[in-house]
């Protein structure tokens, strides 16, 4: 069997509000190398998973999200001015600039943004009978936690500015062949796991009396 490498990119709360830093010092810090040649690296305040070949990616990102098999990379970015709000159009423009600055085709990178500095990123692996899952996570839930069912605080149709950052960004990397339906189920499981972790922290929503999800 030809082993494919699958990837899930999950934005589990809000998008960031901020701008791309100008003049990135293009020094890459390799965080993890996979046996197939893919690499996780950090450059300034961005963490990138660079794909050596085609990978099947399922992403909830607004920027090149959905089901893709033509991406060059996926990334998680912490902006230099995280308190400066912007519209979705501004977010897209900033992500386009960032991708090009990093040397990628902006149409072939799926991105996330967060108020969490990339020095705080966590990378963990778990394996079972040859199947390995790598989780690459940033969590800034204390800044702006919400709960499913809370009143929406952002209206894209009205072109409002994005709210204060409050993200839990999860990137999951699988080293095995997975049917599309199972990959979608894995995204649901990741969401449930994130909710369980928040419940263990007894972290309340900023917008209601319930626990954050």
Please annotate each region the language model reported.
Residues 23-213:
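Alpha/propeptide regions of enzymes that mature by internal proteolysis
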Residues 7-8, 25:
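Intrinsically disordered, low-complexity segments enriched in glycine/proline and serine/threonine
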Residues 1-6:
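Positively charged n-region of N-terminal signal peptides that target proteins for export
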Residues 9-18:
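Bacterial N-terminal signal peptides
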